[in-house]
């Protein structure tokens, strides 16, 4: 890369941060000194809820940027860690003493300003940016605990990949957070294999955030603030406004990745996997049009949160690995849950949960025939179909 291009890219990112810094200086100079300003504190305090493989990776990024931008962020970042024992010791004690999440992100050193906190309410105390990053089956319980205990002017970002499906319909997880806690919520999603990012290998992500109705002007969270919070030299951020599109891409690609894993496990080759990915993208777009018509289809076909996430998830993500192992064990009597336990060190493949939820939604709406790949994936998981049935089913798809 030429020196001129490096300079241009650096300027593009830094201009947003510099613009923020200048705005905050003007705000501080023109407004009466608040207690925070008098104490010399930065305007944003950040907390992370969730400390699995991906949660810890994002917390690492956030902590690095809180150190890099002291004019914007308070240096200490608390991450909520569900307490458990590791070799007889509390995980949080090991985390804070060794600066490593030995359970879910071993051998990755974490910033010293990242503090593990087992008490959820203490972890988010005083925070005005809260990053949610935990398995989505635990989200409702966490939101109930937080309700009434967070600053109503705080903002949230969801890094979860899934949907909330009820008999009444389907909802974005960012909407669940907003409805349950009152926090205006955006999303972060993309072609983001956690281990690669933790090792600081180059990747991209997409952040979707819309200005809240109660936006209070200078000092509130904006896309520039979020870019400063998440962008790293190895983790490049693109900001868009399509919260629905980014959310759907992150959720449904997990179902497609399971199915791609099935055919990989059967050794059908790359052509077969590409066919699954193509059909999967079509059904992701169809799903978006049916249930979230506000989605910008370009998000799925252009952004990291769409096609790029689908590609990487079907090449090496945990859902793909679970699907591949299940495909190899086809006919052995092992369930998908057995495979999860063997492969994921106590964590879950979100695609299995999402697949079940999408099936229930399509069944309730009498739309099963319109989504043959999603439905076939569900049927294979539950033993109602064989992987060998896939080519014939997809051949007759619209």
From Swiss-Prot:
DNA damage is among the record's keywords: no
Source taxon at top rank: Eukaryota
Pfam families named among the record's database cross-references: NAD_Gly3P_dh_C, NAD_Gly3P_dh_N
Chain residues that bind substrate: 161, 318-319
Catalytic activity line of the entry: sn-glycerol 3-phosphate + NAD(+) = dihydroxyacetone phosphate + NADH + H(+)
Record InterPro entries: 6-PGluconate_DH-like_C_sf, 6PGD_dom2, G3P_DH_NAD-dep, G3P_DH_NAD-dep_C, G3P_DH_NAD-dep_euk, G3P_DH_NAD-dep_N, NAD(P)-bd_dom_sf
Compartments (UniProt record): Cytoplasm
Positions annotated as active site in the UniProt record: 253 (proton acceptor)
Keywords annotated in UniProt: Cytoplasm, NAD, Oxidoreductase
The protein's name: Glycerol-3-phosphate dehydrogenase [NAD(+)] 1
């Amino acid at each position: 890369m030429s020196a001129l291009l490096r300079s241009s890219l650096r300027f593009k990112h830094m201009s947003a941060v510099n613009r923020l810094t200048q705005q905050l200086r003007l705000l501080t100079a023109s407004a009466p000194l608040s207690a925070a300003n008098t104490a010399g504190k930065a305007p944003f305090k950040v907390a992370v809820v969730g400390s699995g493989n991906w949660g810890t990776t994002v917390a690492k990024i956030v902590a690095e940027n809180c150190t890099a931008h002291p004019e914007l962020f308070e240096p200490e970042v608390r991450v909520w860690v569900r307490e458990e024992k590791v070799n007889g010791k509390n995980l949080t004690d090991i985390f804070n003493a060794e600066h490593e999440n030995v359970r879910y992100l071993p051998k990755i050193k974490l910033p010293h300003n990242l503090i593990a906190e087992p008490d959820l309410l203490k972890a988010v105390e005083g925070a005005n940016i809260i990053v949610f990053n935990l398995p989505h089956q635990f989200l409702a319980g966490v939101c109930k605990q937080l309700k009434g205990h967070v600053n109503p002017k705080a903002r949230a970002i969801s890094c979860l990949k899934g949907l909330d499906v009820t008999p009444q319909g389907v909802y974005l997880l960012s909407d669940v957070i907003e409805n349950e806690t009152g926090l205006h919520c955006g999303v972060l999603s993309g072609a983001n294999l956690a281990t690669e990012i933790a090792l600081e290998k180059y990747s991209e992500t997409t952040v979707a955030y819309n200005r809240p109705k109660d936006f209070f002007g200078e000092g509130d969270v904006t896309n520039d603030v979020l870019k400063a919070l998440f962008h790293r030299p190895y983790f490049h951020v693109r900001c868009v406004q399509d919260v629905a599109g980014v959310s759907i891409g992150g959720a449904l690609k997990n179902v497609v990745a399971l199915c791609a894993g099935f055919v990989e496990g059967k050794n059908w080759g790359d052509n077969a996997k590409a066919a699954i990915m193509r059909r999967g993208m079509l059904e992701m777009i169809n799903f978006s049009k049916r249930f979230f018509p506000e989605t910008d289809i370009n998000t799925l076909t252009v952004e990291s949160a769409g096609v790029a996430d689908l590609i990487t998830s079907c090449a090496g993500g945990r859902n793909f690995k679970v699907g591949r192992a299940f495909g190899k064990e086809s006919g052995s009597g092992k369930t998908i849950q057995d495979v999860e336990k063997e492969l994921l060190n106590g964590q879950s493949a979100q695609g299995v949960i999402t697949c079940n939820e999408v099936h229930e939604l399509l069944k309730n709406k009498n739309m099963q025939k319109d989504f043959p790949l999603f439905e076939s994936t569900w049927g294979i998981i539950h033993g109602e179909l064989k992987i060998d049935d896939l080519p014939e089913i997809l051949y007759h798809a619209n």
